[in-house]
């Protein structure tokens, strides 16, 4: 999968201000029947997104017309908690979200986001509420800011994850940067 670099990103936001959204709520286990990264978007938030008859739930924010085509999810605390299934990150990415802004994340879910070309940002509740009302926001990853037309918020990110996302690199790309050193090490080994 080619990873598109994230430097400056402008997108529409959708709020989903629940705390403790776990991976089973993101992608119910009944839908974990494949190992490819695509095809999970229709099942993301399945139990909230659809009514019992299979139609869209009009009360689920991402289904509302004003949030159509939103690519930035703003949510609560402890997002992605629960089991460590990478399918949860795949489902959110396949749903159409490139950026998630939460109060906190499960460590494993956070890492799974970065491995799947999504930027997980941590901001406090006041900032998230402000951004949720903005409609459209801009993320500047190199400068680590999230902005509206009239206000800006700083965020922190580990330099390793930042480098990968800014440069569109995955774990294999990072490993290949050390290919010569790996070959030299292997050549020097006496078995």
Swiss-Prot record:
InterPro entries: 3-IsopropMal_deHydase_ssu (IPR004431), Aconitase/3IPM_dehydase_swvl (IPR015928), AconitaseA/IPMdHydase_ssu_swvl (IPR000573), IPMI_Swivel (IPR033940), LeuD (IPR050075)
Gene Ontology CC terms, in alphabetical order: 3-isopropylmalate dehydratase complex
Covalent S-S links between cysteines: none
GO molecular-function terms, A-Z: 3-isopropylmalate dehydratase activity
Pfam families recorded: Aconitase_C (PF00694)
Residue ranges of coiled coil: none
GO biological process terms held by the UniProt record: L-leucine biosynthetic process
Signal peptide: none
Catalyzed reaction equations: (2R,3S)-3-isopropylmalate = (2S)-2-isopropylmalate
E.C. numbers: 4.2.1.33
Keywords: Amino-acid biosynthesis, Branched-chain amino acid biosynthesis, Leucine biosynthesis, Lyase
Associated pathway: Amino-acid biosynthesis; L-leucine biosynthesis; L-leucine from 3-methyl-2-oxobutanoate: step 2/4
Protein function: Catalyzes the isomerization between 2-isopropylmalate and 3-isopropylmalate, via the formation of 2-isopropylmaleate.
Family the UniProt entry places it in: Belongs to the LeuD family. LeuD type 1 subfamily.
Subunit note: Heterodimer of LeuC and LeuD.
UniProt protein name: 3-isopropylmalate dehydratase small subunit
Underlying gene: leuD
């Amino acid at each position: 999968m080619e990873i598109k670099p994230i430097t400056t990103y402008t997108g529409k936001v959708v709020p989903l201000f629940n705390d403790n959204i776990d991976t089973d709520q993101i992608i119910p286990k009944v839908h974990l029947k494949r190992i490819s990264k695509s095809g999970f978007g229709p099942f993301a938030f399945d139990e909230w997104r659809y009514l019992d008859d299979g139609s869209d739930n009009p009360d689920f924010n991402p289904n509302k017309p004003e949030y159509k085509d939103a690519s930035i999810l703003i949510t609560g605390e402890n997002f992605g908690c629960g089991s460590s299934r990478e399918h949860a990150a795949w489902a959110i990415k396949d749903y159409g979200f490139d950026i998630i802004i939460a109060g906190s994340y499960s460590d494993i879910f956070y890492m799974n986001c970065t491995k799947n070309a999504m930027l997980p940002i941590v901001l406090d509740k006041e900032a998230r509420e402000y951004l949720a009302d903005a409609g459209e926001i801009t993320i500047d990853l190199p400068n680590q800011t999230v902005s509206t037309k009239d206000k800006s918020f700083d965020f922190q990110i580990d330099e390793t994850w930042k480098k990968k996302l800014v440069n569109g690199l995955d774990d294999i790309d990072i490993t290949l940067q050390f290919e010569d050193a790996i070959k030299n090490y292997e050549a020097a080994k006496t078995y």
